[in-house]
Amino acid sequence: MRGSSFPGFPSTVASHTLRIATRKSPLALWQAEYVASRLRAAHPDLRVELVGMTTRGDKLLDAPLAKVGGKGLFVKELEQGLLEGRADIAVHSMKDVPVEFPEGLHLAAILEREDPRDALVSHRYRSFAELPADARIGTSSLRRQCQIKCRLPGCSLYDLRGNVNTRLAKLDAGEFDAIVLASAGLKRLGFQERIAETLTPEQCLPAIGQGAIGVECRSTDTRTNALLVPLHHPPTAWCVLAERAMNRRLDGGCQVPIAGFAQLEGDTLSLRGLVGNPDGSGIIRAEAVGHPSTFEALGKRVAEHLLDQGADEILRRVYATP
């Protein structure tokens, strides 16, 4: 389908260059180029260019993300670029995107999800079950930390920052017995052979939106919104939006011990949610099912089940920790 086939904008697609705001990490650039390739395939006359930007999260590499605080650490500067007209769309990892958008911006497309699960990477151990009781494990996520500690209480957890290549290099240097990363990032960068074990949702429930790419743009930019229509994948969107509805009700960010994972099977959308103490001492779980069209209500329902079990107390303690 060529760009000129969409109503609401002129047929002179080639006269305009679509600018994509992206972070500069290898994974972010891969995702932005993937979106660019999808746009070129859908609209052969469209010119596309990447606009690299540095976010606050990219600069604060010495502090654990949980202590940096705030929402949108990896997206705010890209959103500012959209609002200032320096870019037309911004490409994000959905797990980094806050549940609320600045006025004038919205989520225009969610692409088909890659593997949403976490992956164990290790030279010496081929599975989580093989890890010694006192294993040294690297991960920057409170969500992963609470689930790992629950299953392996005697392990030592270390903060792991930087891009995928940097994290793998730290493992290769012998700093850890194992590290836990998102499977999607490893696969997208060609590191799938480094995966020792793909962790099931029962072992480690994924982050909200993990494995999905989102495209943000100005709400009033009718032309750009129309160009993005072929990239949108409704089944993925129903799952991710259910997860995000749960997170919104919990008032959670992407740096807190909250997990959410939705799956679509036929006309049934199921959602599992989790909130846990970072030390693994207590994990609250809830799940529910519904029709895909009720994704918002489904997310809220799972959140209410979690809150009824005391999730708000856990999150209050996490936010109060300096």
UniProtKB/Swiss-Prot annotation:
It catalyses: 4 porphobilinogen + H2O = hydroxymethylbilane + 4 NH4(+). Pathway: Porphyrin-containing compound metabolism; protoporphyrin-IX biosynthesis; coproporphyrinogen-III from 5-aminolevulinate: step 2/4. Keywords: Porphyrin biosynthesis, Transferase. It comes from the Bacteria. Its cofactor is dipyrromethane. InterPro entries: HemC, Porphobilin_deaminase_cofac_BS, Porphobilin_deaminase_N, Porphobilinogen_deaminase_C, Porphobilinogen_deaminase_C_sf. Belongs to the HMBS family. The porphobilinogen subunits are added to the dipyrromethane group. This is Porphobilinogen deaminase. The lineage of its organism: Bacteria, Pseudomonadati, Pseudomonadota, Gammaproteobacteria, Methylococcales.
